[in-house]
Amino acid sequence: RRDTLRALAGFLDEHPEVGACGCKILDPDGTLQLDSRRGFPSPMAAFCKMSGLSRLFPDHPSISRYHMTYLDPEQTAEVEVLSGSCMMVRKAAMDQVGLLDEDYFMYGEDIDWCYRIHKAGWKIFYVPTTEIIHFRGESGRGAPLRILYRKSQAMSIFVNKHMTRRFRFFPLWLLQVGIALHGIFRFVFKTFRATAMPLADAALVLCGLKLGLAVRYHQE
């Protein structure tokens, strides 16, 4: 929308304690992208997301904490993570925590930035009074395995950078393995779904053709 930058800048002007804010992010079909607002990664959040519990209990604050689906998408709310596709950061916050970490490539840098902003004492807000359309996945189109690798790499960087001390009694390598396996499962599932449906359609067409020919020759 034309007023998006003005709306976000105005929100920062009205709330000096806020270090970053982001708007509602939509798919081209108007569906809300869950990455519009999220919670920080943690072993519990990862388990609930990868096990499917967050989908079964989308309104439970503890179980659906990663995508914060318990929040009303039409209400302004304090969150932990914003999508890098549309995030406005206060200059004072940037001066304090620095810019995006260049160790990340395409994924995870927004989570890392929000974590540092939050840790420095700034608030982070989701502002749905304005919105953008995000054509996600375009940068990685045609390279699914590379994207899977980059996402897993980004989460490994974040875990090693920020979670080693916080969860020092938890075997974080299990979390990294889980993230990698979840990514592989999603890739296999998407590949199967993309190929199975056309093959099923082709099989039905061939069966119909064979049945039609059999009936025709039987009548003759």
Q: What name fits each language-model region?
A:
Residues 3, 71-131:
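A short, conserved alpha-helix in the catalytic core of glycosyltransferases
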Residues 211-219:
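Juxtamembrane "helix-exit" motif on the non-cytosolic side of transmembrane helices
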Residues 39-40, 103:
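A generic structural motif
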